[in-house]
């Protein structure tokens, strides 16, 4: 697999996350998204953005009835948002992006459903469970010219958002010539 592919994906993931987090207020049009799966804790970030009116969730694909009921109750979601068949949901709703908060082993199926429709996909880290899956996902992304992003949660940290705001938005420290970051979790 091309060694330059994953750093590019990481950069794209950071860019998408920053766009979703930092520029929603300035956006003329809200992003239309489909959520694939509700079993990853990071789904609460997008659900909270939905609750604040910062993003349009046009559909949710989830097979676990208990999760569906819990999210319907917590976020007052209508039945019409839910469809267990991701392919049918994507064809009907035509979102701009699919956010995959499902099991890692199911990330490939999300890309296989979305890529042929020209819909970009963000998955939670890690990208895949095997190199073969990752290579297939990369091949689909190239073939259908979509963005395939991996969400590294550290980009959502308040400290990183503040650093971005100070350096990029407010230009508080001037031009950055070199940057060394030690970040992450175990």
Q: Language-model segments: which ranges?
A:
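Bacterial Sec-dependent N-terminal signal peptides
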Residues: 1-28
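N-terminal Rossmann-like dinucleotide-binding module
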Residues: 21, 25-75
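A contiguous active-site-proximal alpha/beta segment in oxidoreductase catalytic domains
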Residues: 28, 128-186
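Hydrophobic residues in well-ordered beta-strands that form the structural core
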Residues: 35, 123, 148-150
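Histidine-centered active-site/metal-ligand motif
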Residues: 39-42, 107, 120, 185
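Residue-level detector of anion-binding/catalytic polar loops
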Residues: 56, 120, 147
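Short, Asp-centered acidic motifs that coordinate Mg2+ and/or phosphate
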Residues: 59, 96-97, 178
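Beta-loop-alpha module in the N-terminal Rossmann-like domain of NAD(P)-dependent dehydrogenases
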Residues: 77-140
């Amino acid at each position: 697999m091309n060694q330059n592919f994953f750093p590019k994906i990481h950069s794209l993931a950071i860019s998408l996350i920053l766009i979703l987090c930092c520029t929603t207020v300035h956006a003329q049009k809200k992003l239309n998204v489909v959520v694939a799966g509700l079993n990853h804790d990071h789904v609460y970030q997008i659900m909270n953005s939905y609750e604040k009116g910062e993003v349009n969730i046009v559909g949710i694909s989830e097979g676990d009835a208990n999760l569906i009921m819990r999210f319907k109750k917590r976020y007052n979601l209508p039945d019409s948002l839910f469809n267990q068949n991701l392919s049918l949901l994507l064809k009907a709703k035509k979102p701009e992006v699919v956010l995959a908060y499902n099991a890692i082993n199911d990330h490939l199926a999300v890309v296989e459903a979305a890529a042929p429709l020209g819909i970009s996909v963000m998955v939670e880290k890690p990208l895949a469970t095997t190199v073969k899956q990752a290579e297939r996902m990369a091949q689909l992304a190239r073939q259908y010219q979509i963005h395939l992003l991996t969400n590294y949660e550290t980009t959502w940290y308040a400290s990183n958002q503040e650093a971005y705001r100070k350096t990029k938005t407010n230009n508080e420290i001037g031009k950055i010539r070199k940057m060394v970051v030690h970040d992450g979790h175990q």
